[in-house]
């Protein structure tokens, strides 16, 4: 049938471009269904995919959406429950980072003092502003695509002044190598592996609440962080100051856009990333926050300790159960590859009480368990939003203290 249609249409389509587009569509229909090593899902034909690849994002034109699945049904796009249209309403120059013209500062204004860390995309140093003598953080970027650098700068500029968002002070580059560096405010943080075991029940409530302020703000500005983890949450415990840092993987949220699932650090990857669901949203950050919170209250870091991405899903399934995982997959018309399905196996849901012991019981209250349970959900649509999380009973003491403090000022 397809061959006959192809022959007839080829006779009538005299334009080479039209013939090429038709050929792509027919070949896609004739080809055997291609499967990811992890997941079998709906396949979108090449004609449906807009020619727009921005840092792993693919825009799908709904007017040309053709999906082929085992059930021959089209899966509706998943959209964020909150702040869905932020970047639809705002002018293009708010989120169009590829058009950003960087205003470079003077590199000679800053001197490196000592190395404080390194990541996949950068090396981080404590520095000093030679003019003001103030400490700063210098993030020297490794060679990456210019649009990725522009994206991080644009996002930091848009979030400037937001609660508990690290402040970008300057952007400079070496005159010879053209290597760019981002200059940030200095935060005198303690390594989380040293700090977390010393935190009280109230400390954890306080710092998670402060982190939620940062997340709700960035989400309200149409931005997903996509790499929430202890390494990226700087805490100056003496000043009780928290800053959410490293916005290198952050991205603007556009409803209907498919995003790269190769984001976030393994132990904090949401199930949506592990099953290759690309139309994820801000709720990814809430899963990562939940993993971080579980590690803090149960004193088990990391909480889900997978050896690779497939094993990460196995570790999650052993806690949340496979019946719930299958319900999630069915809802979004996804299917695990047989190899991964075999690895995951069958597991019943484990009650959170199983993780309570003599060392952590003083941190695990009923409201803490309820809060955690509403974050660590397979279905990203069922997780608390950052604003909903801030209203949870777990933070009643923190909200009361904040209200009292504001009244006394």
Swiss-Prot record:
Glycans are attached at residues 72, 188. Inhibited by heparin. It is found in: Nucleus; Nucleus, Nucleolus. It comes from the Eukaryota. Residues 1-35 form the signal peptide. Keywords: ATP-binding, Glycoprotein, Kinase, Nucleotide-binding, Nucleus, Serine/threonine-protein kinase, Signal, Transferase. InterPro entries: CK2_alpha (IPR045216), Kinase-like_dom_sf (IPR011009), Prot_kinase_dom (IPR000719), Protein_kinase_ATP_BS (IPR017441), Ser/Thr_kinase_AS (IPR008271). The active site is at residue 227. GO terms for biological process: regulation of circadian rhythm. It is an enzyme of class 2 (transferase). Residues 110-395 form the Protein kinase domain. CDD domains: STKc_CK2_alpha (cd14132). Its main location: nucleus. Its EC number is 2.7.11.1. One of its GO terms (molecular function) is ATP binding. Pfam families: Pkinase. SUPFAM superfamilies: Protein kinase-like (PK-like) (SSF56112). GO terms for cellular component: nucleolus; nucleus; protein kinase CK2 complex. ATP binds at residues 116-124, 139. Casein kinases are operationally defined by their preferential utilization of acidic proteins such as caseins as substrates. Phosphorylates casein in vitro. The alpha chain contains the catalytic site. The tetrameric holoenzyme CK2, composed of two alpha and two beta subunits, phosphorylates the transcription factor GBFl, resulting in stimulation of its DNA binding activity. CK2 phosphorylates the transcription factor PIF1 after an exposure to light, resulting in a proteasome-dependent degradation of PIF1 and promotion of photomorphogenesis. CK2 phosphorylates translation initiation factors. This is Casein kinase II subunit alpha-1. The lineage of its organism: Eukaryota, Viridiplantae, Streptophyta, Embryophyta, Tracheophyta.
């Amino acid at each position: 049938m397809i061959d006959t249609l192809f022959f007839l249409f080829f006779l009538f389509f005299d334009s080479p471009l039209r013939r090429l587009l038709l050929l792509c569509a027919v070949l896609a229909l004739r080809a055997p269904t291609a499967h990811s090593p992890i997941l079998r899902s709906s396949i979108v034909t090449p004609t449906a995919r807009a020619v727009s690849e921005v840092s792993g994002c693919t825009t799908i034109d709904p007017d040309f959406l053709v999906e082929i699945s085992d059930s021959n049904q089209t899966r509706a796009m998943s959209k964020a429950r909150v702040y869905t249209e932020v970047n639809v309403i705002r002018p293009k120059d708010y989120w169009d980072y590829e058009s950003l013209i960087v205003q470079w500062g003077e590199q000679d204004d800053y001197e490196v003092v000592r190395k404080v860390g390194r990541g996949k995309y950068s090396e981080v140093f404590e520095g000093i502003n030679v003019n003001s003598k103030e400490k700063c953080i210098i993030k020297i970027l490794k060679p990456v695509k210019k649009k990725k650098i522009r994206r991080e700068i644009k996002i930091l500029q848009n979030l400037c002044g937001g609660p508990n968002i690290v402040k970008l002070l300057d952007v400079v580059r070496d005159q010879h190598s053209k290597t760019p560096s981002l200059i940030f405010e200095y935060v005198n943080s303690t390594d989380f592996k040293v700090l977390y075991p010393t935190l009280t029940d109230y400390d954890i409530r306080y710092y998670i609440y402060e982190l939620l302020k940062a997340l709700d703000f960035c989400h309200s500005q149409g931005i997903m962080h996509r790499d929430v983890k202890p390494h990226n949450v700087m805490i100056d415990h003496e000043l009780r100051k928290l800053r959410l840092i490293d916005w290198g993987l952050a991205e603007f949220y556009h409803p209907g856009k498919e995003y790269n699932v190769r984001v976030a650090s393994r132990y904090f990857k949401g199930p949506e990333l592990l099953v290759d669901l690309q139309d994820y949203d801000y709720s990814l950050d809430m899963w990562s926050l939940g993993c971080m919170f579980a590690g803090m209250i149960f004193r088990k870091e990391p909480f889900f300790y997978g050896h690779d991405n497939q094993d990460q899903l196995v570790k999650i399934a052993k806690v949340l159960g496979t019946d719930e995982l299958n319900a999630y997959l069915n809802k979004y018309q996804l299917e695990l590859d047989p190899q991964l399905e075999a690895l995951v196996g069958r597991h019943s849901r484990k009650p959170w009480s199983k993780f309570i012991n003599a060392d952590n019981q003083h941190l695990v209250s009923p409201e803490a368990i309820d809060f955690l349970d509403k974050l660590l959900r397979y279905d990203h649509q069922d997780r608390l939003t950052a604003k909903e999380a801030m209203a949870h009973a777990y933070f009643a003491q923190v909200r009361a203290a904040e209200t009292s403090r504001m009244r006394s000022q």
